[in-house]
Amino acid sequence: VTEASTEPVGTFCLVLHTHLPWLAHHGAWPVGEEWLHQAWATSYLPVLDVLDRLALEGRRNLLTLGMTPVLAAQLDDPWFVDEFRTWLGFWQVRAESLASHRDPSMRALGSREFVASQRALAAMAGAWSGGLSPVLRPLVDSGAIELLGGPAAHPFQPLLDRPWQRFALRAGLDDTTLRVGRRPEGIWAPECGYLPGLEEDYAALGVRRFLVDGPTLQGAGGTTADAVTVGDSDVVAFARDLEVTYRVWSPRKGYPGGRWYRDFHTFDHASGFRPARVTSTATPSHEKAAYDPQRAAEAVRVDAADFVDVVRRRLVDLAAERQGRPGLVVAAYDTELFGHWWHEGPQWLEAVLRALPEAGVRVTTLAGAVEAGHVAGPRHLGAGSWGSGKDWRVWDGEAVADLVDDNERLRDRVLKVLAIPTPDRDPVRDQLARSTLLALSSDWAFMVTKDSAAGYARDRHDRHHREARLLADLVERGDTTAAGSLAARLRAVDGPFGHLDARLLPGSA
């Protein structure tokens, strides 16, 4: 009798990209701080709770977590931590207001929301009392997750000049190092944006791996079943397997659209809560059925089992195509999908992470995939992104041509102003660099192109540009008093990356 093989059928890597732009002090509703509060309460708390629970069971190499420096700065900010606690308190009050509602389903909704708010408040009084980093660091130290860093304020790197590209990435890596005590070896390249030659700057800054979208690698003759070394470097690129990734969520379909899941778009406007299930995509909001958490939990079990089956079948097929050599599947998503957009997402995530190893699939991180030998190459990749068309059109298309021009002029202007050497750090120059980085965030162009809170995005773009130009004018004129006063006011509102040293920018060339 031959014993069944205990070798895994292949390797699966789940990558979660955790990002929101700098929102602190820039409006509340409907876009602004409210956006971050909701994502914090419904995604970041429950997703990290899932990871912590699995880590306490001794599980390691669960997934790869990208955490952008600009988001981490907000989740660690004592002011924002206090603001979030206040927001959670109002959440609880809103839940209590449903206790006497005449509709039993609304009373049940209030009870669920009250319990959820209690759980969140307890987390903020406990492990999260000091912000994100005290929660994140043990997961990194224990090997439960691999943490990806990235450029400071999430710029679309292919559109940056080399000095700014290196400066933003160095600042971001430094920031993550300060927060978790170790320098990331991998990064999430914002928007999976790639330009040939970026790997050279990655290598120079100690980055050993990054992600691109599947078509970027496939266009170079590669396959998503292997990571590759890029160009003449030793830097490794991983690519999303879109066949598997899109099973969960794509621009047109995915599990969150299932009829039993909570509907994201239907609100009880008096309380602000979501009382309905999807029912069907064609059902008007006022006709959607009440949410049933038990039926939703059953849907989670069904969809988790389906995903495990999809991953396993994909890996079995890859092994057959590769004469028995195990393949790699990388699925990558925004963390905010799990909990915020898809209420049941954290439950599904936990179920999948438990079930995949039982199905004979090796679950690991990007670093673990390298150690397991899933690296081919080299490949010379072409330009790409994970946006519409898999090119750069979202960030350099006609709808945002004026933003692109503004960014180019600002980069050139500030680079010239900061090129004059200074022996000591200057808080005015540091703030000029900081304001410029915030102006260059990829989010503003994305929101305009997608017409998603486009007015807010244009306002943010214009404001950061206006403030940076004014500060540059004062520096050039030598008006140290006015420049110092303006820089201090800006720092009070836009003050992430306190370690930022503008003297490093000219030297990045």
Where are these regions (language model features)?
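Active-site and substrate-binding clefts of carbohydrate-active enzymes
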Residues: 2-62, 67-112, 116-119, 222-509
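Acidic (Asp/Glu)-rich catalytic clusters
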Residues: 6-8, 52-60, 131-148, 177-180, ...
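Short, solvent-exposed turn/loop segments enriched in Gly/Ser/Thr/Pro and often Arg
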Residues: 66-71, 151-153, 186-195, 366-371
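Glycine-rich phosphate-binding "P-loop"
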Residues: 149-171
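CE4/NodB-like, metal-dependent polysaccharide N-deacetylase domain
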Residues: 165-189, 310-323, 327-332
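Conserved short loop/turn motifs at secondary-structure junctions
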Residues: 183-194, 334-338, 453
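Hydrophobic, small-residue-rich alpha-helical packing segments that form membrane-like cores
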Residues: 193, 198-207
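His/Asp/Glu-enriched short active-site or ligand-binding loop at hydrolase and phosphoryl-transfer sites
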Residues: 208-219, 362-365
